[in-house]
Amino acid sequence: MAGLKNTSYNAVHWSQLAPEEQIRFWEDYEAGRATTFLVEPERKRTKRRRGEHSTKPKCENPSWYRPERYKALKGQLGHAYNRLVKKDPVTGEQSLRMRMSRHPFYVQKRTFVGRKYAFRPEKQRLLDAIWPVLVSFSDAGTHTVGMSVTRLAEEISPKDSEGHVIPELEVTVSRLSRLLAEQVRFGVLGVSEETMWDREHRQRLPRYVWITPAGWQMLGVDMVKLHEQQQKRLRESEIRQQLIREGVLREDEDISVHAARKRWYLQRSQDALKKRREKAAASKRANRLKKLPVDQQIYEMAEYLRKRLPPDEAYFCSDDHLKRLAIRELRQLELTLAAPPPH
């Protein structure tokens, strides 16, 4: 067909059109408005336009290694971490030994998760950096990473000399959440089955991930030894002892990995709810106290603390000591007294 021009990949031949559209096509062809037998579909009218803002991430090259003060990982968890990270015997500098983003597993399962191409360079670097964190904080019994997605993003973000995250270079929670969700689709990570809804704060409770057998196989660990160490840790776990005390399990019964994970996540959810309630109550108390004079703030806080003290401690607590406690509590509420507390 001479005179055909390059068209979009989703163009169709005129014979595949509906009868009414075929008649309209031949009318345009005879009038000279159509120069090809391939017809592009009509685009939807939209006001969306490509912005001029930068789409590159804040932290383009994240990295994380276990600090020297951390104890060395034992068993197959330590073997997995050592396969990921190597340490220079002379300088003591740590670097990546294996880049997980280049593992053949991701190439084999690429189409299964809906990907056509390999990871982009910035995603590769984030994926390489997050795996040492996942292995380092993974529980030996449940293989659950003991940090929420928000805490993981904070852990992997660059920090200043005081240990605070640099806002301009942070790894955002949304970016890491998208990466972990894709790893769940690959099957190398699992995610907590239930995400409870916090009605008061109108947001969900933290989510946690755990490393699946496919993920451990990618790391090259001995699966038999890993399973033995996992069962041993579960038998010694506090969760199993708690279930035995509650009468749910007998002394000779073992707890399953799924039940241990579910129980662990329930405890974390309850802790998060308790912490949020305490934070909300402290915020309301601070908003009420900041409208009062400084002396009244100290008096109100002292009375509040007096009611919360145990009876024996409240009996021997002097007014000066209670005042110091009140000033310290006000400082924690950031209601602030410029002068240091009395000694």
Curated annotation (Swiss-Prot):
Molecular functions (GO terms): DNA binding
Gene Ontology terms describing biological process: DNA replication; plasmid maintenance
Region (Disordered): 42-61
InterPro entries from the UniProt entry: Plasmid_replication_init_RepA
Keywords: DNA replication, DNA-binding, Plasmid
Chain ranges passing through the membrane: none
Function: Binds specifically to the motif 5'-AANCYGCAA-3' (repA box) in the origin of replication. Acts preferentially in cis; binding to the repA boxes is sequential, with the boxes closest to the DnaA binding site being occupied first. It is involved in promoting open complex formation by unwinding the oriB at sequence 5'-TCTTAA-3'.
Protein name: Replication initiation protein
Organism whose genome encodes this protein: Escherichia coli
